[in-house]
Amino acid sequence: MFSKLTNIVLFIVLLLFCDVPLKAEQLKVTGKPHIIDGDTIKINSINYRFSGIDAPEIKQTCKKNEEVIYCGIIAKDKLVKKIGSNIPLCVQESIDRYNRIIAECFVKNKSLSKYLVR
């Protein structure tokens, strides 16, 4: 009926389709967060850096109308307020050159990255 090559190809295709849901499940995490700074949260002892944004570092200052403001603390505080008591869902997108997990994180189906850059 089927040639050996056809059976091998069918087997490989089947493996590929079976593997997709497992990988997608492994890339999602949810849990009580610890906010590190404006673009990084820790869930279950793992840091997740938000994709698509670069918030000020926690000790970073900025100037607004010649006044020094603590923009790193402001960014973190905005994130703390937005998350509140909600449990975020983070979907891993990649790992950067510094070996950090890059993820899109959501609260109530709203992107935290988009919220922070609005």
Q: Can you annotate each of these PLM segments?
A:
Residues 2-118:
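Small beta-barrel nucleic-acid-binding modules, primarily SNase/OB-fold domains
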